[in-house]
Amino acid sequence: MNTQPLRVGIGGPVGSGKTALTLALCLALRERYNLAVVTNDIYTREDADFLVRNEALAPERIIGVETGGCPHTAIREDASINLEAVDQLNRRFPGLDLILVESGGDNLSATFSPELSDLTIYVIDVSAGDKLPRKGGPGICKSDLLVINKIDLAPLVGASLEMMNSDTQRMRNGKPFVFSNQKTGQGLEEIIAFIERQGLLTAA
């Protein structure tokens, strides 16, 4: 058993599908692992409430943090409020295997700081256009796993998945990425396999 839980940071632009991915991961992993979640919202606990409503986990396993401020920095820069939430969950549920920390915005300095996250997943979506990967940035280039979500929208927005694939390979320089569609579950098993492999998770 891990002495400390694996902490996986999930970041990405507003509306990219972070909460849908967090829900899918909870539903898929809750029978395998001792699991909890921290969500970050600006002035509400909307993401936490969404997870509770959809019965992702028992409500006491989900802590919603209200960060204040603008959506692009919707996780405190020093990560202290999130670290306190993680500590609270550790005290509440001794022997946790995994804590998912979902950022409320696309600011990466705290979400992806080593003190808060052991592994980082960055979610973008196809509706933002097929040029997004080549624009780069820390999330696209440096996250441990990049998830390109909502691939079902590609025909509707005129996005080329082939172009996104080649641009992403170039920008990430060998780091892994996954195309996903949370509505159908496409890509979810690859994401889970990555978390288990890279995080050295072993199911009880």
From Swiss-Prot:
<keyword id="KW-0547">Nucleotide-binding</keyword>
<comment type="similarity">
    <text>Belongs to the SIMIBI class G3E GTPase family. UreG subfamily.</text>
</comment>
<keyword id="KW-0143">Chaperone</keyword>
<dbReference type="GO" id="GO:0016151">
    <property type="term" value="F:nickel cation binding"/>
</dbReference>
<protein>
    <recommendedName>
        <fullName>Urease accessory protein UreG</fullName>
    </recommendedName>
</protein>
<dbReference type="GO" id="GO:0003924">
    <property type="term" value="F:GTPase activity"/>
</dbReference>
<dbReference type="GO" id="GO:0005737">
    <property type="term" value="C:cytoplasm"/>
</dbReference>
<dbReference type="Pfam" id="PF02492">
    <property type="entry name" value="cobW"/>
</dbReference>
<comment type="subunit">
    <text>Homodimer. UreD, UreF and UreG form a complex that acts as a GTP-hydrolysis-dependent molecular chaperone, activating the urease apoprotein by helping to assemble the nickel containing metallocenter of UreC. The UreE protein probably delivers the nickel.</text>
</comment>
<keyword id="KW-0963">Cytoplasm</keyword>
<dbReference type="GO" id="GO:0043419">
    <property type="term" value="P:urea catabolic process"/>
</dbReference>
<dbReference type="InterPro" id="IPR004400">
    <property type="entry name" value="UreG"/>
</dbReference>
<comment type="function">
    <text>Facilitates the functional incorporation of the urease nickel metallocenter. This process requires GTP hydrolysis, probably effectuated by UreG.</text>
</comment>
<feature type="binding site">
    <location>
        <begin position="12"/>
        <end position="19"/>
    </location>
    <ligand>
        <name>GTP</name>
    </ligand>
</feature>
<keyword id="KW-0342">GTP-binding</keyword>
<dbReference type="GO" id="GO:0005525">
    <property type="term" value="F:GTP binding"/>
</dbReference>
<dbReference type="InterPro" id="IPR027417">
    <property type="entry name" value="P-loop_NTPase"/>
</dbReference>
<keyword id="KW-0996">Nickel insertion</keyword>
<dbReference type="InterPro" id="IPR003495">
    <property type="entry name" value="CobW/HypB/UreG_nucleotide-bd"/>
</dbReference>
